[in-house]
Amino acid sequence: MEKFEGYSEKHKSRQQYFVYPLLFQEYIYAFAHDYGLKGSEPVEIVSCNNKKFSSLLVKRLIIRMYQQNFWINSVNHSNQDRLLDYKNYFYSEFYSQILSEGFAIVAEIPFSLRELSCPKEKEIPKFQNLRSIHSIFPFLEDKFLHLDYLSHIEIPYPIHLEILVQLLQYRIQDVPSLHLLRFFLNYYSNWNSLIASMKSIFLLKKENKRLFRFLYNSYVSEYEFFLLFLRKQSSFLPLASSGTFLERIHFSRKMEHFGVMYPGFFRKTLWFFMDSLMHYVRYQGKAILASKGTFFLKKKWKCYFVYFWQYSFSFWTQPRRIHLNQLANSCFDFLGYLSSVPKSTLLVRNQMLENSFLIDTRMKKFDTIVPAIPLIASLSKAQFCTRLGHPISKPIWTDLLDWDILDRFGRICRNLFHYHSGSSKKQTLYRLKYILRLSCARTLARKHKSTVRTFMLRLGSVFLEEFFTEEEQVFSLMFTKTTFFSFRGSHSERIWYLDIICINDLVNPLN
């Protein structure tokens, strides 16, 4: 218990930063707007009428914030009818939007200052390639070969938004800022309604991405803090206090309550944390926990996560959100790939003098396959082909210039090949290339009111070069005898590009 409290105070002590006065500074909102324009996911401060950032409206907002009844009037206006009181609703909607964007920027300041205050000798080295999504796959190739079971976890959202506010109390002592956060969340939901609170999370995620991202990252870092502590102390858990992963506030009361509900629970099951080979990966609201051991051990971990979220964050998560898989007998969808660790048999002939032996060796290999059906469904949704995979024209692009049409189709094809370059079998990618190439030809033929055959004969090799991917260009230098689009030598070659930091719905259809 004392060891856990010391670890908690060392890494998560409350910060004595008061950020509320910064909300009265005009440059904060200008910085938030500029940050959204330059970010990887542009987030503009807009009004309900799609009007962009206005310094004049920001000045009016700051003046009104000094008024005593500003917040009360804002709540009243937000509950009024849009048609009957459009002017007041417009200002209320705009002020709420711009305040939430500015608050998200201001709330990140204590966390940034804490990182800057760390001694230089304790700084974690930063590698640019760690930003890439593909940097995960080489790690999985090295680690998953020695593991047995995998838990695929869908990280649950807190049902009640007040939980998100309480999590920030451990890090920020600025009470006015916390009250302001409650005001923003109250703007999106009726706090007395459970169903409305669940809907408000998705509404907040859609309209205020930066604020939602900040709250979600705070929640994720909180639960990963407990998981990291248990992971570091796994070899000492049988001797440590059994309640170290519970919430720090009202610790004794919760311990007694937990002890009454589940007498002797910890003493009997603490041993299942003794696992030195455990690896954790988080991505897109999901997490993967892989380790050695038995299936019974993984079931214990599943029960732990259910009770962990229930008693640490006061909300129930469905056990079906945690899927248990055996790596040798099943595959799992991960960032657009179907991944698995199958066992393959390798027959080796050993010759010793006049005697020869056949040695049967079993090996594991981290296999990644591109799923054909979901990708074709994504192309069908984007109107490049039918549901069965037959290419069709895209009429909405017929008004563009010919080279713009070629560039758009070629860029989609190159992006698909670029992202799925680590696939062990690339037949699916060549099928997608055929669909996009023929869809492009039919779109151009429709624009010029011609046939596909006539149009392709007129363009010739120029049309094909637009779909010649970067990966094939690299291999064509290695194998000079290959010709355009007859090249098939890269089927078994796997390249993980370390410059991919985001993916779209077309590349990642499984989610």
From Swiss-Prot:
GO terms for molecular function: RNA binding. GO terms for cellular component: chloroplast. The keyword Transmembrane does not apply. Keywords: Chloroplast, mRNA processing, Plastid, RNA-binding, tRNA processing. Pfam families: Intron_maturas2, MatK_N. Its main location: plastid. The keyword Chloroplast applies. It is found in: Plastid, Chloroplast. GO terms for biological process: mRNA processing; RNA splicing; tRNA processing. Belongs to the intron maturase 2 family. MatK subfamily. Usually encoded in the trnK tRNA gene intron. Probably assists in splicing its own and other chloroplast group II introns. This is Maturase K. It comes from Melica altissima. The gene is matK.
